[in-house]
Amino acid sequence: MSKKQFYLVREDMLTDAMQRTLEAKALLSAGKVRKINEAVHRVGLSRSAFYKYKDGIFPFHAIAKERIMTFSINLADRSGTLSQLLNIVADTGANILTINQTIPLQGRANITLSVDTAPIEIDINELFERMEALESVERVELVGSGS
């Protein structure tokens, strides 16, 4: 599994496509446009570039205020797997808010886990690493965040 890292980067260091993606996201969140197609057209960005970067680039103020993170986790269907995963999250000091698990199909289950990270005692990168280090974890993705 690839290790996910998070960085704080000055705006002038971002590629043009990344900067335009941020502009398009700002238009959408402010309600100045209703559709992605309108936003990318207004900022002069292709839809494919927008979709490439939209889930991976955020303004710093948006991340700094985020407390609740939602993860999508693919697990192998083995006894005790979910319990091990929840223990890893709880051991960081994070507060588990919601857990949704699909019925295991073909030996795999998907878990959606919402976590309050305000009380967390480690770096978010470390949390990702610990979850991904579980032998039964096949994939961990951050699918959303909010306050």
Curated annotation (Swiss-Prot):
Gene3D superfamilies: 3.30.70.260. It comes from the Bacteria. InterPro entries: ACT-like_dom_sf (IPR045865), ACT_dom (IPR002912), UPF0735_ACT_dom-cont (IPR008310). SUPFAM superfamilies: ACT-like. Residues 70-145 form the ACT domain. HAMAP family: UPF0735. Belongs to the UPF0735 family. This is UPF0735 ACT domain-containing protein ABC1543.
